[in-house]
């Protein structure tokens, strides 16, 4: 779970939800703070209706090369995390994450 990178500070409510879901479902995760690099989350979070984003990353070696290596278990955990967080979202949780009464 990316907490912060070069261009985006993650929504703390979304992070809390992801951590709750991971604990409940037994999905292993780590928190990450990056001083360099970024994702599209910064742009997405301020586009249109300012959509909160949750950045899930997979630890890997030789990123952005032809030989990017990662553990199969980490890919499976990231997929499980994403699927379970999506399943956990309902209107009430989305409002809580967005801090607004009407979507």
Residue ranges and their predicted role:
Residues 1-76, 85-89, 93-103:
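Active-site-adjacent substrate-binding region
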């Amino acid at each position: 779970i990316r907490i912060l990178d070069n261009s985006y500070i993650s929504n703390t409510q979304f992070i809390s939800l992801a951590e709750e879901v991971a604990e409940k479902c037994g999905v292993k995760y780590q928190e990450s703070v990056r001083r360099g690099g970024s994702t599209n989350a910064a742009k997405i979070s301020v586009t249109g209706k300012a959509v909160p984003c949750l950045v899930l990353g997979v630890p890997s070696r030789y990123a952005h090369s032809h030989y990017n290596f990662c553990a199969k278990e980490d890919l499976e955990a990231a997929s499980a995390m994403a699927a379970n967080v999506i399943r956990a979202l309902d209107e009430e949780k989305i409002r809580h994450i967005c801090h607004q009464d009407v979507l």
